[in-house]
């Protein structure tokens, strides 16, 4: 947050959202995560990754990567059902505000590889209360050269939907689902010549070009260089340029 020079970090394992100063020291501030989204409510490795802050409304936004235990089986190859995530907002005071049902796409992969992850990994608030939500499918089969990722970015407008009631049962989520519009989609894959496999997990605003076009940045997590000498993940920053507005 530029207003107070704090860096807010979401913890995928412990479900805490904590503030730090730019020198790395704890700021002793934390968002009040509801028990329904707490550590015991998530499937391991599918907790909070996405975290964004809307400066216009002074609102934090977060969501778990995949479904909560209470909402059924996570979305994965062979699941055969729709999954809805609970998109949660917080005020600048750290207290929870409204939550909304986000409809997660079903995976494209037919089977899980040795390493697999799927779900929402980033949220980027836009002007007018809009949110860009990035979904990522990461699949590494036994044959590493077939490893690939699929990225999809959607736009949702929570203000145009209906907030979830307090403690809604999972079967109600579909009737509250937000409408989402596609923004962009692309894939990366491992290959011997010019490999571009990237585990993108970050999305943020970049610089504005001289002709007025916006840029946005995708940040890849290499998981410490996961893989072997020939086939492994790398840290990437991908620059995307919005179409020129006529």
Q: For each of these PLM feature ranges, what is it?
A:
Residues 1-246:
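Sequence/structural signature of beta-propeller domains
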């Amino acid at each position: 947050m530029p207003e107070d020079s704090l860096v807010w970090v979401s913890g995928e394992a412990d479900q805490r959202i904590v503030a730090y100063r730019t020198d790395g020291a704890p700021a002793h501030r934390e968002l009040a995560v509801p028990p329904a989204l707490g550590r015991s409510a998530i499937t391991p490795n599918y907790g909070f990754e996405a975290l964004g802050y809307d400066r216009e409304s002074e609102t934090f936004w977060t969501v778990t990567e995949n479904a909560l235990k209470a909402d059924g089986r996570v979305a994965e190859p062979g699941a055969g059902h729709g999954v809805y995530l609970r998109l949660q907002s917080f005020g600048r005071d750290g207290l929870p505000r409204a939550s909304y049902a986000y409809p997660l796409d079903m995976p494209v992969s037919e089977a899980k590889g040795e390493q697999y992850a799927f779900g929402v990994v980033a949220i980027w608030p836009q002007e007018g209360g809009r949110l860009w939500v990035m979904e990522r499918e990461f699949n590494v089969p036994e044959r590493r050269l077939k490893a690939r990722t699929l990225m999809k970015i959607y736009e949702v407008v929570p203000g145009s939907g209906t907030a979830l009631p307090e403690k809604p049962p999972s079967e109600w989520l579909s009737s509250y689902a937000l409408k989402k519009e596609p923004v962009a989609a692309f894939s990366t894959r491992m290959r011997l010549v010019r490999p571009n496999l990237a585990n993108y997990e970050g999305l943020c605003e970049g610089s504005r070009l001289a002709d007025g076009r916006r840029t946005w940045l995708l940040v890849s997590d290499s998981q410490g260089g996961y893989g072997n000498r020939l086939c492994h993940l790398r840290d990437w920053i991908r620059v995307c340029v919005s179409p020129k507005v006529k």
